Swiss-Prot record:
Organism: Rattus norvegicus
Composition bias type Basic and acidic residues, residue spans: 90-100
GO molecular function list: calcium ion binding; calcium ion sensor activity; calcium-dependent phospholipid binding; calmodulin binding; clathrin binding; phosphatidylinositol-4,5-bisphosphate binding; phosphatidylserine binding; SNARE binding
Keywords linked to the UniProt accession: Calcium, Calmodulin-binding, Cell membrane, Cell projection, Cytoplasmic vesicle, Exocytosis, Lipoprotein, Lysosome, Membrane, Metal-binding, Palmitate, Peroxisome, Phosphoprotein, Repeat, Synapse, Transmembrane, Transmembrane helix
Name of the protein in its database record: Synaptotagmin-7
Modification after translation (UniProt): Palmitoylated at its vesicular N-terminus; palmitoylation is required for localization to lysosome and phagocytosis in macrophages.
Residue intervals annotated with topology Vesicular: 1-16
Mode of membrane association: Single-pass membrane protein
Length: 403
C-alpha cells in the first residue's frame, strides 16, 4: 500500500500548525515591543506638554542707558521688530533660553475680566492681597501715547527691594514687556547683574498702534532673574489695563510686584526641620513630607524625591538625596541628613533643597526649590534664624516650592 510521505503521524504537529504557531509568536512579540515603545513616547511627550516652553532671546547686558527699542505694529495687527538696539547681538535660535509659558497665558484669562481703575502711584488695588504676602519688591515705570505718531511709549525706570533668587544672595534682574492679549511679541530690558535695586531707564516704543486698539490692551511687566544655564526664575509681575489710564501724557507708576501666575503655590509645599548643634558644628536637615506637588507626568502624578545641597561661598560642598516615592503628590519621606558646618562658616552657607520628579527614560524634572540661609527670602530667613536661636532643637516649617 502506498503511504503519503507528507502525512504526519497522529501525535505529531503538521507543518501548517507549526507555521501558524510561529506567526502568532512573532505577532505577539512585535505587539509587546510596540506597546512598550508607545508607553515610553506617551510618558515623554506628556512631560514635555506639562512643561511647554517658549523661545526667548537672551537680554543683552551691554546696552546703554536711555536707549529706545521699537516694535512697529501695522494695521494687520502683527508686531514686527523694526529698530534693533545699538550693541545688541542678533537673536540666534541656538543661543536661546526657555521659560514657562503659563504665567502670561494665565494672566490673559484672569485680567481681561478684571479691569480695575488705577491712578498713577496708587497701590490701593493691591490692598486685597493682604499684608502677609511675601515682599517681592516694586517697580517704577511710565506709559503714554503720542496721537500724532500713533505710538505707545513705555519707559522702565527702576526696581527696589527685589528678592534674592540666587544662592549667592542676589539676583540678575531684567524686565519683559507685553501688551496682552498678544503673548507672542515682547520687548526686554538689559540684565542688571547682581543687583536687587536695579536702574534700567530704558524706553520702548510700540509704533503704528491705533489708539482704539491700545485701549483694548493690558500692559504687562514681568521681572525675572536671568540664569545663563537654566530657565530664568520669575520674580514678580505688574499689569495695568490701558483703558483705565490717561494716556494723553506720560503717567508714572510705582507698583508692588505680585507673584507670577505660574507661581510657587502651584508647585506644592515641603515640610522640613533644621537642627543646629554648635558644639558638634553640624546641621541636621530632616525632610519630613510634601503636599500638593505639581504633577509632572501625563498620568497626573509624579515620582518625587528630594536633593539636598550644601553650598559654601557659592560652591557645592556635599549632596544628599532621599528615596523616590512612586506616583505620589503627597509623599512622606522622614529622612535626615547631617552636614558638618563650622560656626564661623554659617554666614556664607546655603542649603539648597530641590524636589525632583524621577524619570527612567528621560532627564529628571525639577518640581521646585527652597534656598535656606540668612539672606534668602523672608520665610527661609525666619527658619534659619529660628534654627540658630534654638540650638539642639529640631525646628520644623512648611515652605512653598519655587521655580
Amino acid at each position: 500500500m502506498y503511504r503519503d510521505p507528507e502525512a504526519a503521524s497522529p501525535g505529531a504537529p503538521t507543518r501548517d500548525v507549526l507555521l501558524v504557531s510561529a506567526i502568532i509568536t512573532v505577532s505577539l512579540s512585535v505587539t509587546i515591543v510596540l506597546c512598550g515603545l508607545c508607553h515610553w513616547c506617551q510618558r515623554k511627550l506628556g512631560k514635555r506638554y506639562k512643561n511647554s516652553l517658549e523661545t526667548v532671546g537672551t537680554p543683552d547686558s551691554g546696552r546703554g542707558r536711555g536707549e529706545k527699542k521699537a516694535i512697529k505694529l501695522p494695521a494687520g495687527g502683527k508686531a514686527v521688530n523694526t529698530a534693533p538696539v545699538p550693541g545688541q547681538t542678533p537673536h540666534d535660535e541656538s543661543d536661546r533660553r526657555t521659560e514657562p509659558r503659563s504665567s502670561v497665558s494665565d494672566l490673559v484669562n484672569s485680567l481681561t475680566s478684571e479691569m480695575l481703575m488705577l491712578s498713577p502711584g496708587s497701590e490701593e488695588d493691591e490692598a486685597h492681597e493682604g499684608c502677609s504676602r511675601e515682599n517681592l519688591g516694586r517697580i517704577q515705570f511710565s506709559v503714554g501715547y503720542n496721537f500724532q505718531e500713533s505710538t505707545l511709549t513705555v519707559k522702565v525706570m527702576k526696581a527696589q527691594e527685589l528678592p534674592a533668587k540666587d544662592f549667592s544672595g542676589t539676583s540678575d534682574p531684567f524686565v519683559k514687556i507685553y501688551l496682552l492679549p498678544d503673548k507672542k511679541h515682547k520687548l526686554e530690558t538689559k540684565v542688571k547683574r547682581k543687583n536687587l535695586n536695579p536702574h534700567w531707564n530704558e524706553t520702548f516704543l510700540f509704533e503704528g498702534f491705533p489708539y482704539e486698539k491700545v485701549v483694548q490692551r493690558i500692559l504687562y511687566l514681568q521681572v525675572l532673574d536671568y540664569d545663563r544655564f537654566s530657565r530664568n526664575d520669575p520674580i514678580g509681575e505688574v499689569s495695568i489695563p490701558l483703558n483705565k489710564v490717561d494716556l494723553t501724557q506720560m503717567q508714572t507708576f510705582w507698583k508692588d510686584l505680585k507673584p507670577c501666575s505660574d507661581g510657587s503655590g502651584s508647585r506644592g509645599e515641603l515640610l522640613l526641620s533644621l537642627c543646629y548643634n554648635p558644639s558638634a558644628n553640624s546641621i541636621i536637615v530632616n525632610i519630613i513630607k510634601a503636599r500638593n506637588l505639581k504633577a509632572m507626568d501625563i498620568g497626573g502624578t509624579s515620582d518625587p524625591y528630594v536633593k539636598v545641597w550644601l553650598m559654601y561661598k557659592d560652591k557645592r560642598v556635599e549632596k544628599k538625596k532621599t528615596v523616590t516615592k512612586k506616583r505620589n503628590l503627597n509623599p512622606i519621606f522622614n529622612e535626615s541628613f547631617a552636614f558638618d558646618i563650622p560656626t564661623e562658616k554659617l554666614r556664607e552657607t546655603t542649603i539648597i533643597i530641590t524636589v525632583m520628579d524621577k524619570d527612567k527614560l528621560s532627564r529628571n524634572d525639577v518640581i521646585g526649590k527652597i534656598y535656606l540661609s540668612w539672606k534668602s527670602g523672608p520665610g527661609e530667613v525666619k527658619h534659619w534664624k529660628d534654627m540658630i536661636a534654638r540650638p539642639r532643637q529640631p525646628v520644623a516649617q512648611w515652605h512653598q516650592l519655587k521655580a
